[in-house]
């Protein structure tokens, strides 16, 4: 199930959960996740961001539509590579790019600017 991220309270809860999880078992993606979240807010068609829910909590999967291209994208954490992946269309789509804290904000901006 998903929830529309239509207000700052939902986005705040999502960011809080991402940072909590990154402090426990994904220490190498917290800063990159915050950069990516800001970039998605910049690029997304207003009202298009959806966040997966799991047992009533917000989970690590996000779907959004680009305001510029109207294409759909999915973001999820890959537990094997310990990176966040941006995928084409869905969480099963082609990986467009992967990021971690080693990815510079400039690189994330460059990758997002093409979407």
Residue ranges of model-derived segments:
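N-terminal non-globular leader segments, chiefly Sec-dependent signal peptides
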Residues: 1-54, 109-115
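Amphipathic, interaction-prone secondary-structure segments
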Residues: 44-85
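Intrinsically disordered, low-complexity regulatory segments enriched in Ser/Thr/Pro
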Residues: 70-110
